[in-house]
């Protein structure tokens, strides 16, 4: 570029300082490690606030790292407690220069509004859609989407919540999908024969139940499932869910999938 002759440009990457990491319950070790490793490797200190429902994995990871003797004193801290109390302190404290958050959209928006000029890294949820085209390998598509719908009882940000299936294959796809769902084994996750376990607590299961009941009351069709037993909610498939229902607009975070038929994109 004219005027740039004999000039040198370069980037200098420097640690940001203290990173605040706020993690969810659904992957209590993996998602903590995802934040701790890069933060330390880049020369930062990090304060981890794990979900109050699953703090032990973060504590054990920190214990292992600190007992190794490889970390300078004080660069890794784990603080447990309510997110509304401890999380707010981390987000607002000017000494914390970056917030890394994995969790729901509403909490992410709240953090963004409070963080000021801090750097922010977020992994947020959604009511994730999958499109199945007419040339899809039917059996593979069914198997992949059943697993995507009900893995971890739907408690992950990659949960298949909305399935848009082309009209040309809709009927055979749905028949196979329902049959595979009916064969899904629900029970104790310590049993290797179990496909799907319970939700994190009964409040979460009741929330899923309420969202499904709302959709059914609004005219949705229940193809399979729709039953709660304590913290367990059966793998559930619906169609004709009205767009105004919370199930069509919000992340359900449970084992529920909605089927849609389409002809053109």
Where are these regions (language model features)?
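Short, solvent-exposed loop/beta-turn-alpha elements that line the ligand-binding surface or hinge
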Residues: 248
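Glycine-rich nucleotide-phosphate-binding loops and adjacent flexible coil segments
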Residues: 255
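ALDH superfamily catalytic-core signature
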Residues: 67, 74, 106-242, 261-265
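Cofactor-binding beta-sheet edge motifs in enzyme active sites
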Residues: 252
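Rossmann-like NAD(P) dinucleotide-binding subdomain of oxidoreductase/dehydrogenase enzymes
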Residues: 1-140, 262
């Amino acid at each position: 570029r004219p005027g740039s002759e004999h000039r040198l440009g370069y980037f200098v990457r420097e640690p940001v300082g203290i990173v605040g990491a706020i993690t969810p319950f659904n992957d209590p070790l993996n998602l903590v490690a995802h934040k701790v490793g890069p933060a330390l490797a880049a020369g930062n200190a990090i304060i981890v606030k794990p979900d109050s429902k699953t703090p032990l994995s973060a504590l054990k990871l920190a214990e292992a790292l600190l007992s190794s003797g490889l970390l300078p004193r004080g660069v890794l801290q784990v603080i447990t407690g309510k997110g509304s109390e401890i999380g707010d302190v981390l987000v607002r404290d000017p000494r914390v220069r970056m917030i890394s958050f994995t969790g729901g959209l509403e909490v992410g928006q709240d953090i963004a509004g409070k963080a000021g000029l801090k750097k922010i890294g977020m992994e947020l949820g959604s009511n994730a859609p999958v499109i199945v085209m007419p040339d899809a390998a039917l059996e593979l598509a069914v198997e992949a989407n059943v697993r995507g719908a009900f893995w971890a009882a739907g408690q992950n940000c990659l949960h298949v919540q909305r399935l848009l299936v082309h009209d040309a294959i809709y009927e055979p796809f749905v028949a196979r999908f329902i049959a595979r769902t009916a064969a899904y084994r629900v029970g104790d996750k310590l049993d290797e024969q179990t496909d799907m376990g319970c939700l994190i607590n009964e409040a979460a299961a009741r929330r899923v139940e309420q969202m499904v009941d709302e959709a059914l009351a609004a005219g949705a069709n229940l193809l399979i499932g729709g039953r709660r037993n304590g913290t367990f909610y059966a793998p559930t498939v619906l169609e004709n869910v009205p767009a105004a229902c919370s199930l069509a607009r919000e992340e359900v975070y449970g084992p529920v999938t909605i089927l849609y038929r389409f002809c053109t994109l």
